């Protein structure tokens, strides 16, 4: 058989792009789970634009998110966040990293469901605390008890995050490993193929 007669093996990335069509990929989850880092690398793999919703919100408002919280309050921020995410999804397809509270808004969840595939990057309490301690600009953690705040937010948000289309365990492994798991799981979800069995630490982390 000549080389020309051999079937062309499609790549996972090509399969995903074909199945996505005009839809985007939206990463949801708590602060510190790696939405921006993983999203940027996924976008590079898929050759899609990467967009960070928080960065877009700051650009639209002309001030940082801590400044928005301080001057106008969380309610004002959430309204602007919903508008920005709606605009970004209308311009898809992109890989979009959202803020930790964005998915809590029902209208935003509905818009994401209609225009994207959502991935919940799920991390446990200790992983989140280790990561968020590295940054001092988290408005919701400007309290006397940031650890208690993370516990409360996890309790409130995880049942809602679980409505995402897919769940991937965010843990302390190389970022490219998480990206590969996202790609494999996306391909299986979109194309109906059986994804490779996740390693034991993934299976236990997402239960």
Swiss-Prot record:
Disulfide bonds: none
Keyword Amino-acid biosynthesis belongs to the record: yes
GO annotation (BP), single: chorismate biosynthetic process
SUPFAM superfamilies: P-loop containing nucleoside triphosphate hydrolases
EC number: 2.7.1.71
Cofactor, how bound (note): Binds 1 Mg(2+) ion per subunit.
GO CC list: cytosol
Family: Belongs to the shikimate kinase family.
Role noted for this protein: Catalyzes the specific phosphorylation of the 3-hydroxyl group of shikimic acid using ATP as a cosubstrate.
Protein name (Swiss-Prot/TrEMBL): Shikimate kinase
Organism: Bradyrhizobium diazoefficiens (strain JCM 10833 / BCRC 13528 / IAM 13628 / NBRC 14792 / USDA 110)
């Amino acid at each position: 058989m000549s080389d020309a007669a051999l079937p062309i093996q499609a790549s996972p990335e090509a399969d995903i792009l074909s199945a996505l069509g005009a839809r985007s990929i939206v990463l949801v989850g708590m602060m510190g789970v790696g939405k921006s880092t993983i999203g940027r690398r996924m976008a590079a793999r898929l050759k899609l634009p990467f967009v960070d919703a928080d960065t877009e919100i700051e650009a639209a408002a002309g001030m940082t998110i801590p400044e928005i919280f301080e001057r106008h309050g969380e309610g004002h921020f959430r309204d602007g966040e919903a508008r920005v995410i709606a605009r970004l999804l209308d311009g898809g397809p992109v890989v979009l990293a959202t803020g930790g509270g964005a998915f809590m808004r029902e209208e935003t969840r509905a818009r994401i469901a209609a225009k994207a595939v959502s991935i919940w990057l799920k991390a446990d309490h200790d992983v989140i605390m280790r990561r968020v301690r590295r940054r001092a600009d988290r408005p919701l953690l400007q309290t006397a008890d940031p650890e208690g705040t993370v516990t409360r937010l996890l309790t409130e948000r995880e049942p809602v995050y679980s409505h995402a289309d897919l769940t991937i365990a965010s843990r302390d492994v190389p970022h490219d490993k998480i990206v590969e798991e996202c790609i494999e799981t996306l391909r299986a979800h979109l194309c109906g193929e059986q994804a490779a069995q996740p390693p034991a630490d993934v299976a236990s982390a997402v239960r």
